[in-house]
């Protein structure tokens, strides 16, 4: 007897907390890259009733007004930004991670191939829709 397999998915609207957080983090990344194409952004966003929390590591040569980015997104998706407290807990990328991103271990050990010159802070393959 063959076992049935089911695939499921979830679709949410732009005001849903998961979608809202994705849009905010994407907008923060876009803002950083507009000002500095070499920006490094590892940004997490959490939304709950009346609160948005942005945390992570951002290295950008220009100042980004993260609270303004968050409030613009809230307005764009139909929320009143004045009804939210926005907390930002962001710092620059750690030197340990920057060292791995700036120059791969293989490169530091003498490998001169082009792909060994590329560094990475962390690696993963993900897919999804925001």
What are these regions (language model features)?
Residues 1-130:
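A domain-level signal for the structural core that forms small-molecule/cofactor-binding pockets
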């Amino acid at each position: 007897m063959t076992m049935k397999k089911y695939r499921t998915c979830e679709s949410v609207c732009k005001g849903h907390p998961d979608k809202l957080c994705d849009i905010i983090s994407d907008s923060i990344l876009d803002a950083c890259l507009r000002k500095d194409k070499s920006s490094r952004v590892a940004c997490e966003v959490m939304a709950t009733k009346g609160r948005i929390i942005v945390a992570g590591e951002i290295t950008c040569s220009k100042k980004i007004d993260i609270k303004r980015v968050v409030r613009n997104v809230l307005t764009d998706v139909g929320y009143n930004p004045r009804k939210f407290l926005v907390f930002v807990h962001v710092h620059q990328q750690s030197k340990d991670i920057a060292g791995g991103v700036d120059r791969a271990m293989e490169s530091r050990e003498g490998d001169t191939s082009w792909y060994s010159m590329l560094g990475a802070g962390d690696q993963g393959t993900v897919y999804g829709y925001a």
